[in-house]
Amino acid sequence: MISLSGLTSSVESDLDMQQAMLTNKDEKVLKALERTRQLDIPDEKTMPVLMKLLEEAGGNWSYIKLDNYTALVDAIYSVEDENKQSEGSSNGNRGKNLKVIDSPATLKKTYETRSASSGSSIQVVQKQPQLSNGDRKRKYKSRIADITKGSESVKIPLVDDVGSEAVPKFTYIPHNIVYQSAYLHVSLARISDEDCCANCKGNCLSADFPCTCARETSGEYAYTKEGLLKEKFLDTCLKMKKEPDSFPKVYCKDCPLERDHDKGTYGKCDGHLIRKFIKECWRKCGCDMQCGNRVVQRGIRCQLQVYFTQEGKGWGLRTLQDLPKGTFICEYIGEILTNTELYDRNVRSSSERHTYPVTLDADWGSEKDLKDEEALCLDATICGNVARFINHRCEDANMIDIPIEIETPDRHYYHIAFFTLRDVKAMDELTWDYMIDFNDKSHPVKAFRCCCGSESCRDRKIKGSQGKSIERRKIVSAKKQQGSKEVSKKRK
């Protein structure tokens, strides 16, 4: 970590380089100076900070230019505030152990206030200067350097350029966790030789022939050697999602989604689509973690950002880099609940919960007597990852959810992974189609209006969105436009 206080002491030694950059009229430098001059920041204050950021970013301008040079402006004002504090009395400082975090993407001050009971730290968001109608004003912004708290392999910042929304309250987790009663039996002994590739070495995708783990995808790997989802597999999954009636389904005798908890009876099962799975290699396989058939297990690799949208959709997720078609983005992570636990949780909760559950129903119809502890769902309301911020978009979303088999060969439990459906440009929002039927009055998602902005929006009766923005609740289901009646009862 580099202290911003070192910027002022290094100004003289860098003057020659600064002058050279100005003399050469570097276009990128001039654009940065144009922005800071709008805020009445003199060049002699901008240049040393800019050089330090470039050094820290390895000469990469992407983060510096992000959001109209927000990182640069933040850094300049951080240096100013630090200099003022060093000149003044230390009695005015609140808290202890003042630290300056100078990440090129998100610069802010952190006051660590240690508590005897929790040892927690409190982050104080710094004021951010901006222009409004030509006038220089300061506006509060929510800015968190890494919402994952170091639990992912990449940092994922959170920003609110609108400055009107509180940071959402939830516990970030990188892996699914069992809430209470869900039956999840993960055991190497339960994985037979036919369900693993014990004789493989290194990278399975480099072998002459596909291994046993490729059996689920018709004897071919679903991934390319570049780590992307193959186009043919991706297109088939998309067709199944858009035209589910054209593909086989299985039907439950007593479907958990059609259960009336008050009467103890079951309605008719509408069928569960037999989805295409990807089976990844796992611990009993002979390959290593760099195997090309372990894409989802390696976790998030893309540069992502949680941000507050300006289209009435609340918080959203966007990419900070260009992404090719078939790129793995993240899993949908949450608590593993039984269908009954989900029903009870929704009955007890308020109507402003932030997420909807993921129903893991791909194998329900194959069971003669499906036990409640085997009818599982994922709920990211209290604990989850960045997927809880992904907004819905009708018909033309740029991501799709794919079921992934990893730890267990049965389909009571599996992973949900998101892949891009097309090339996605940096700063574009990442979206996926929840398959909501807005004409279904009993559907729980009907509680909010669709603001996706798609020309093919299925909620045509609602135009625009006004009033206070709320974080939208998310849902994905293996069924065609079906929601849990247990959830909808709570919403009535």
Curated annotation (Swiss-Prot):
SUPFAM superfamilies per UniProt: SET domain
Compartment(s) of residence: Nucleus; Chromosome
GO BP terms, alphabetized: chromatin remodeling; methylation
Domain Pre-SET: 196-299
Gene Ontology CC entries for this record: chromosome; nucleolus; plasmodesma
Keywords attached to this entry: Chromatin regulator, Chromosome, Metal-binding, Methyltransferase, Nucleus, S-adenosyl-L-methionine, Transferase, Zinc
Residues holding Zn(2+) 1: C196, C197, C200, C204
Molecular function in Gene Ontology: histone H3K9 monomethyltransferase activity; zinc ion binding
Pfam families: SET (PF00856), WIYLD (PF10440)
Amino-acid positions noted as binding Zn(2+) 2 in the UniProt annotation, renumbered to this chain: C196, C213, C281, C285
Family annotation (InterPro entries): Pre-SET_dom (IPR007728), SET_dom (IPR001214), SET_dom_sf (IPR046341), SUVR4/1/2 (IPR025776), WIYLD_dom_sf (IPR043017), WIYLD_domain (IPR018848)
Catalytic reaction annotation: N(6)-methyl-L-lysyl(9)-[histone H3] + S-adenosyl-L-methionine = N(6),N(6)-dimethyl-L-lysyl(9)-[histone H3] + S-adenosyl-L-homocysteine + H(+); N(6),N(6)-dimethyl-L-lysyl(9)-[histone H3] + S-adenosyl-L-methionine = N(6),N(6),N(6)-trimethyl-L-lysyl(9)-[histone H3] + S-adenosyl-L-homocysteine + H(+)
Main localization (coarse): nucleus
Positions that bind Zn(2+) 4: C394, C450, C452, C457
Positions of the UniProt region annotated as Disordered: 112-138, 463-492
Enzyme Commission number(s) of this protein: 2.1.1.-, 2.1.1.366
Residues at which S-adenosyl-L-methionine binds: K313, G314, W315, N391, H392, Y434
Domain SET: 302-435
All copies of domain Post-SET, residue ranges: 446-462
Membership in a protein family: Belongs to the class V-like SAM-binding methyltransferase superfamily. Histone-lysine methyltransferase family.
Domain remarks: In the pre-SET domain, Cys residues bind 3 zinc ions that are arranged in a triangular cluster; some of these Cys residues contribute to the binding of two zinc ions within the cluster.
Assembly: Interacts with ubiquitin.
Protein name per UniProt: Histone-lysine N-methyltransferase SUVR4
Gene that this polypeptide is encoded by: SUVR4
